[in-house]
Amino acid sequence: MHSFQIFSDGACDLTLEAQNAYQISTVPFYVSFDGKTYLKELKELTLDHFYHHLIEEKGFPKTSLPSVHDFVEAFTPALEAGKDILSLHITHTLSGSMQSALTAKLMLEEEFPNAKIHIVDSHNATGSQALLLMEAARMQQEGKSLEEVVSYLEQAKKDTRIIFMIGSLTHLQRGGRIGKIAALSSNILKIKPIIVLRDGEIHVGGATRSRKKGIAELVKLTAEHFQKSGENPADYIAMVGTTDVTEEIAPTEALLKAELPQLELVSPLQIGATISSHTGPGTTGICIAKRYECYSL
C-alpha cells in the first residue's frame, strides 16, 4: 500500500504548529491590502499583521486563490517521493481553489501516470474543514488506506457544520456575498447575523441584537442539529473558532459543554485571513464533524 500525503488549501486555518503535528501540508491563499501586492497567508503574512490592518486601520483586504502552479509546486515533491495525494478544499461555492487543484492534478497525471491524486471538496471552510482534516490525519496515523480516508471525507462532509455569528454584514456586502438591502437592514438595526454553512451552501440561521445572546443562539442551533437529525453528540468532535474576539471562546465552550456534555471539544481555532476578509471582525463560530469510526468505509 502506497503512503500518501494530505494537503489542504489555506482556508482550513490550521496553524503551522498544527500542520506539523498532523503532517498536513497547506497551499496558502493570497491576501492584499492595496489590491496590488499579494502576500501568502501565514507564510508571508502573520495573523497579527492581518488583524491589525482589518481592525485598527479598518481595511478591506482582498484575497486571491492559490494558482494551478502553486498546487503543482506543492504536490510534485510528494509524487517524486512515490507518495499518493489527498487534497481537501474549501467548498467550491466560496472559492475556486478546488478547480486550481483539479487542473494541477490533470497536468501531474501526465508526468506521474501511476500516482493516485484525490481532490476533495470539503463543502466546508475554516474550522469545519480543519476538523475533517484532523480526522483524516488520525486515520492515516492509524493505518487506514487512502481510499478509506476519501470515503470518510465524502460521507462526513454532509454531516459537518459551522454555525457562526458575525459583527455586521458590511464585509460580506462589500465582497458581493449578499444583497445590499440585507446589509443595509443589518447595519441600521445593529443586529448580529447568524449564518450556517451546510452542504457547501450558506443559510441564514437568524439574528440577535447582542453578542451574549448570539453565543447562546449558536449553542442552541448546534443542539438542534442533534435533535433534528437524531445523531449522537458523542459521535462528534467540535471546536470554537473566532476572528479577533478570543474572549468569547471560554463562554462559548462553557455553554456548549453544559448543553451537550457528550460532545468532545478540541482546541479552539483562530479564523484566518481568507475567511475573515469576507466576514470581517467580530466573528465567532461553532464547528462540528463526525468521527470516522461512525461510518462504513
Regions found by a protein language model. Give the residues of each.
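Short, flexible active-site-proximal loops enriched in glycine and acidic residues
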Residues: 83-87, 115-120
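Hydrophobic residues in alpha-helical segments
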Residues: 54-55, 79, 140, 173
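Glycine-rich phosphate- or other oxyanion-binding loops that anchor nucleotides, phosphorylated ligands
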Residues: 56-94, 99, 103, 150
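Mixed-charge interfacial surface used for oligomerization/domain docking
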Residues: 11-19, 24-25, 30, 93, ...
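Generic beta-sheet signal
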Residues: 4, 83-87, 236-238
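N-terminal glycine-rich anion-binding loop in soluble enzyme alpha/beta folds
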Residues: 5-65
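Short active-site oxyanion
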Residues: 2-6, 264
